From Swiss-Prot:
UniProt keyword terms in alphabetical order: Late protein, Viral baseplate protein, Viral tail protein, Virion
Localization of this protein: Virion
Species in which this protein is naturally found: Escherichia phage P2
Function: Baseplate protein that may be part of the wedges of the baseplate.
Primary localisation category: virion
Gene from which the chain derives: J
InterPro entries: Baseplate_assembly_J_pred (IPR014507), Baseplate_J-like (IPR006949), Phage_Baseplate_Hub (IPR052726)
Keyword Endoplasmic reticulum: no
Family to which this protein belongs: Belongs to the P2likevirus gpJ protein family.
Protein name: Baseplate protein J
Cellular component terms (Gene Ontology): virus tail, baseplate
Length: 302
């Protein structure tokens, strides 16, 4: 069953668009309506004065209402899988019997103590979505993905292929180093997927590490004339880093068009790429890893 992309869902109706000026105008209109008709025009003129003490009271009251409505919005988002974060997401995960994984345990022997590195909200949210797949006993792709991802916090991604009937190949991408899964991690995943309540009797499961395809990015930015170039370069690097991180998953291609799009931030006139020179197309058992990226400015064309 395909996973719904929560980022593509429309904003929920329960979350209200807030506007201070609209709330203040409603407050003023309500106050004016409380006066007799022959006094309403004079009160309305008074409320147009910013220095009027009554206006200050209404502004303070409107601001408090704005804060309260925002708190209601936050409370509504906190119970939605698409919006919840942190402890709120942990509570939602408990409803699906899916807990957040520990990537690196806490170390109390250091000074100061090193806190544990936990699974990110994005990865945890995906596993929660797949929780019902984990109930399947028919060996579905989703079930193998769920149990594989839940086996260990070091698992960054899982792919499931069937090269022949009753043969299942599980490729594991690790969060450690460049993504190659260690034998220790493969053993943990193998044990998790061979449980009697997970693997159908007829399935023969092979667990292997993802094949890592390394690449580099070397780009030159040509800018429109302006006083400073470094903020523009920094913005381009930030978007490029986000793209590199997002594509470090199984089966995600590295496309030149996407690199150009990431680097074309406000202020960039054109981009020249020295590397890569072609798209890097991957299958579901492969993952990319950027060993180095270099973004420099080449001045202005004008």
């Amino acid at each position: 069953m395909p996973i719904i992309d929560l980022n593509q869902l429309p904003a929920p109706d329960v979350v209200e668009e807030l506007d201070f000026e609209s709330i203040l105008a409603e407050r003023k209109a309500t106050l004016i309506s409380l006066y007799p008709e022959d006094q309403q025009e004079a009160v309305a003129r008074t409320l147009t004065l910013e220095s009027e003490p009554l206006v200050k009271l209404l502004e303070e009251n409107a601001y408090r209402e704005l804060i309260w409505r925002q708190r209601v919005n936050e409370a509504a988002r906190a119970v939605m899988l698409a919006c919840a974060a942190g402890n709120d997401l942990d509570v939602i995960g408990a409803n699906y019997n899916t807990t957040r994984l520990t990537i690196t345990p806490a170390d109390d022997s250091t000074i100061p103590p090193t806190p544990a590195v936990m699974e990110s909200d994005t990865d945890y949210r995906l596993r929660i979505q797949q929780a019902f797949e984990g109930l399947s006993v028919a060996g579905s792709v989703g079930a193998y993905q769920y149990h594989g991802r839940s086996a260990d916090g070091r698992v960054a991604d899982i792919s499931v292929t069937s090269p022949s009937p009753a043969c299942v190949t599980i490729s594991v991408l690790s969060r450690e180093n460049n993504g190659v899964a260690s034998e220790d991690l493969l053993a943990v995943v193998r044990n998790a997927l061979n449980g009697e309540d997970v693997r159908p009797v007829a399935d023969r499961v092979t667990v292997q590490s993802a094949a890592i395809v390394e690449y580099q990015i070397n780009a030159t930015l040509y800018l429109y004339p302006g006083p400073e170039s470094e903020p523009i370069r920094a913005a381009a690097v930030k978007k490029l880093e986000a793209y590199i991180t997002a594509q470090h998953r199984l089966g995600r291609d590295i496309r030149l068009s996407a690199i150009y799009a990431a680097l074309h931030v406000e202020g960039v006139q054109r981009v020249e790429l020295a590397a890569p020179l072609a798209d890097i197309v991957l299958n579901s058992t492969q993952a990319s890893f950027c060993t180095e990226y270099r973004v420099v400015t080449g001045g202005s064309d004008e």
